[in-house]
Amino acid sequence: MMKSRFCPSPTGLMHLGNARTALFNYLFAKSKDGIFLLRIEDTDVERSKETFDLGLQEDLRWLNLEWQEGPGADEGNGPYHQSKRQAIYDDYYQRLEEADQAYPCFCSEEQLRLSRKIQRSAGKPPRYAGTCRSLSAAEIEKKKAEGLQPALRFRVPDDEVVVFADLVRGEQRFQTNDIGDFIIRRANGTSPFMFCNAIDDALMGVSHVLRGEDHLTNTPRQLLILQALELPVPTYAHIALIVGPDGSPLSKRHGSRGIKELRDNGYLPLALTNYLARLGHYYASDELLSLAELAKGFNVESLSKSPVKFNAQQLDYWQKQTVNQLPNDDFWEWAGSELQSQIPTDKADLFLTTVKPNVSFPRDVAYWVNVCFGKTLNLETAQSELLRATGNRYFEEAFEAFKKFGKDLNSVVSHLKEKLNLKGKPLYQPLRIALTGAEHGPELAKLILIMDYETIQNRLQEACQ
């Protein structure tokens, strides 16, 4: 059975980049009636935190990316935290050493740094120089007796080519002579990503690895490990990374935020999944799609090879589409029961139908609740100046028109047009700003029907001051 996976490191909060990777793996699995697996890669003992681990899982559940295998689900191939799998890795280290496919390396970080510097100055790509590759058993024991703790390096075969078919990028070829022997166990005994990631994919039955293109150069190394251990090899697909509008790595200065921050600010999960699913993947439909619909239209061959640019406005577009399609009960659960309680029952339906198409976040709902039912508006300086420039007569005539015609906006506007000889923006804008504090928004005629007559009178009088 097809099985994809998402394997984050709990060293920080989930950001848009790894949320997108998780989503693509989820959609890929669902499109093939496969299994979506979650594995926590927490071998970085110093930086891994349980709070981040739980936060990552919470974010995935909030996005409705439920895993069928992993922590809290089917744990048949577990444990799914790499920190609990060291004995498994140790067994494979022993197999490699016994087959002379791995060897101890006693080089210090300073020695390695100097070696890389010399290679770069000679115009060569930095790779391990093989200093410890041919140490005899006696030399190894002597160094250990001196108290030196070795790392373990994989012995990369000379003069070979590692070839694999990437589902996104086509055939990939890597010369082993350019790779160099690499570390598969640190000197402190812990396992780096390169090794345990490959081992776990094989042992957990992962058939497809869909990950960022920054892992592309890891793949030949992991293939060499799996082939040496005669373990099954997954199919790989390396997706383009998200970058900022200027083409540089995505960061907060581009408007990127973590999933928790987006959630706390009122973004909805379906808005994020619709935006991220289209970030480097083509969908024929430009409608808001459910996760099932996104999965049905997902095709790994439709993934872009080029970096994809983050666009905060596009994310907000999908947020607005999602809010507009929320059932009423879900809308108020999202906006908050406190806001709902401020709306008179007899005006709740009209308020919702009037305001809903014009809001994207709970703070927007709060604004229009205050417009319709609050006592004061906080005008911006430019708005106050516009009202002063309009002159008191406009608002005095508007006051009288509302007294005469009630909440019939068409009659009020006709009265102003006749009395003041106005048309266009000078006719409509001062009235909208005086009553709502905004230059744009929901249909003014409907807002007026929601407002108390006293509120309308008070705001027109305030505009005269």
Swiss-Prot record:
Single GO MF annotation: tRNA binding
Root EC class: ligase
Residues that hold ATP according to the record: 252
Cellular component GO terms held in the UniProt record: cytosol
SUPFAM superfamilies hit by this protein: An anticodon-binding domain of class I aminoacyl-tRNA synthetases, Nucleotidylyl transferase
Signal peptide range in chain numbering: none
Oligomeric and partner information: Monomer.
Similarity comment: family membership: Belongs to the class-I aminoacyl-tRNA synthetase family. Glutamate--tRNA ligase type 1 subfamily.
Protein name (database record): Glutamate--tRNA ligase 2
Organism from which the protein derives: Coxiella burnetii (strain CbuK_Q154) (Coxiella burnetii (strain Q154))
GN (gene name): gltX2
